[in-house]
């Protein structure tokens, strides 16, 4: 089976490819980036909007991921604004010095500076849309936010997120370790199970 991954985020694409290749699913990269306005109020809505847009452009079943971090002390933030948290009014805007991930992390740590409750969770919703059919799956991983970034692997908020049962941040884990426990990995494995039981998908 072939799926078009509706993203230009290299980190997301790499993780999705690594996990789905274990199940014999071939993933394709879009030839060009589509500007899809994420107007949904939820991760699921935004994933659907992206999957539908890429399917309509390429006529290949499209897989879209919308995911993010929810921090208990400032819930529902960063939430659906996770990738652009630095630039929203809540908590004040943060200057981008090197890259957006760094600015997002800097803002998050600033907001949690005097907060004892550092519980958080990563959430992922993944949609596959094929025109006449569509399916979705979700995954999450709970953990805590560190007081400073650690590790140089992964992307996004990985350097400040320690999953439950671990003493390393996501950015300190190997790709294999991360994919085994991550929100995206869990959602993708659920999705594969649904795909293999959905005759319309083949």
Swiss-Prot record:
Name its co-factor(s).
Mg(2+)
E.C. number, please? 3.6.1.66
Catalytic site residues? Answer: 66 (proton acceptor)
For the protein in the UniProt heading, the enzyme class is hydrolase
Which GO biological process entries does UniProt record here? nucleoside triphosphate catabolic process; nucleotide metabolic process; purine nucleoside triphosphate catabolic process
Q: How does the cofactor bind to this protein, according to its record?
A: Binds 1 Mg(2+) ion per subunit.
Q: Which UniProt keywords apply?
A: Hydrolase, Magnesium, Metal-binding, Nucleotide metabolism, Nucleotide-binding
CDD domains listed in its UniProt record: HAM1
GO CC terms of this entry: cytoplasm; cytosol
Q: Which residues bind substrate?
A: 7-12, 67, 155-158, 178, 183-184
Query: Cross-referenced Gene3D superfamilies, in alphabetical order?
Result: 3.90.950.10
Reaction catalysed by this enzyme: XTP + H2O = XMP + diphosphate + H(+); dITP + H2O = dIMP + diphosphate + H(+); ITP + H2O = IMP + diphosphate + H(+)
Q: Name one Pfam family in it.
A: Ham1p_like
Instruction: Sum up the protein's function in the record's words.
Output: Pyrophosphatase that catalyzes the hydrolysis of nucleoside triphosphates to their monophosphate derivatives, with a high preference for the non-canonical purine nucleotides XTP (xanthosine triphosphate), dITP (deoxyinosine triphosphate) and ITP. Seems to function as a house-cleaning enzyme that removes non-canonical purine nucleotides from the nucleotide pool, thus preventing their incorporation into DNA/RNA and avoiding chromosomal lesions.
Similarity field: Belongs to the HAM1 NTPase family.
Known partners and oligomeric status: Homodimer.
Q: Report what the protein is called.
A: dITP/XTP pyrophosphatase
